[in-house]
Regions:
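Conserved active-site and cofactor/substrate-binding residues in soluble primary-metabolism enzymes
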Residues: 46, 70, 105
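Helix-turn-helix DNA-binding module
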Residues: 13, 76-78
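C-terminal long alpha-helix characteristic of the crotonase
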Residues: 25-30, 81-116
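Terminal peptide-recognition signature
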Residues: 1, 18, 75, 110
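Acidic, divalent-metal-coordinating active-site segment for phosphoryl/phosphodiester hydrolysis
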Residues: 67-74
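CoA-thioester-processing core
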Residues: 5, 11-64, 91, 95
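Short alpha-helical scaffolding segments that buttress acidic/His motifs in well-ordered protein cores
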Residues: 63-67, 110-113
């Protein structure tokens, strides 16, 4: 599994990359936004396809069209975050340690089911 720990600014491609993780731990003060349209681009690195499974369609459209910035706390409510934690790296490492103690064959099988 891939775990993302996000703090600071996570705009555009950074948000797309973080969204590809299996588990996303976000600092509550992180600044996040779908910024591509502001720059004359479209979120075409796979982010939009991922977001459609995480975020309500009307909300995703609004975030994409307006480039509205949101916090890490908002990210949880919107569906972008699995957890919100003031120390995302420590939380991500704790989750990784827990996962590492599980059966790797079962982990791979679960990942295959999730990725269908």
């Amino acid at each position: 599994p891939v775990i993302a720990a996000v703090h600071g600014v996570c705009f555009g491609g950074g948000l797309q990359i973080a969204s590809g993780a299996d588990i996303r731990v976000i600092d509550p003060t992180a600044r996040m936004a779908v910024m591509e349209l502001k720059w004359g681009l479209v979120p075409d690195m796979g982010g939009y396809a991922l977001w459609k499974g995480l975020v309500r369609d009307d909300v995703l459209r609004e975030l994409t069209y307006t480039n509205r910035e949101f916090s890490g706390t908002d990210a949880k409510d919107l569906g972008f975050a699995t957890y919100v934690d003031p120390n995302p790296v420590a939380r991500a490492m704790a989750i990784a340690a827990d996962i590492a103690n599980r059966n790797p064959t079962a982990q791979r099988a679960a990942a295959r089911l999730s990725n269908r």
